[in-house]
Amino acid sequence: NFSVNELQEAQEVMTKHPIVSNQVLYNLNSPRLEQDLLPYYQEHHITIIADGSLATPSRFLTDRRLKILEQVEAQTNRTMAQVALNWCTSRTNVIVIPKSNSVTRTEENCTASGWRLSPAQVRTLDEAFA
């Protein structure tokens, strides 16, 4: 969970073994990561291991955002969780490690892959959660 400055410092001393991944909180409501960290990670080929990829606290899930999520859910015939996970992996060098507390949830999480949100759907979600 490094900031860009911390990651740069670590990279300066880790010349023999480059940093290849970093686990960070990353979900639909991660504008700081989108603006600051993601571009740096992509430029330096560092994989983001998205922790908390299903976490969207209710205070951030406004009626407008919920409506947009429901629209994308209907368009894709997927659940909100699947849409949220797929949105994360629509970014270059991002993988997810979603929490699961049941077999049903694990199966749902697994089916978040093998398909893609359209570029228009990704943009719609980006704009809604910016």
Give residue ranges: language-model regions.
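Beta/alpha (TIM)-barrel catalytic core signal, keyed to glycine-rich beta->alpha loops juxtaposed to Asp/Glu
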Residues: N1-A130
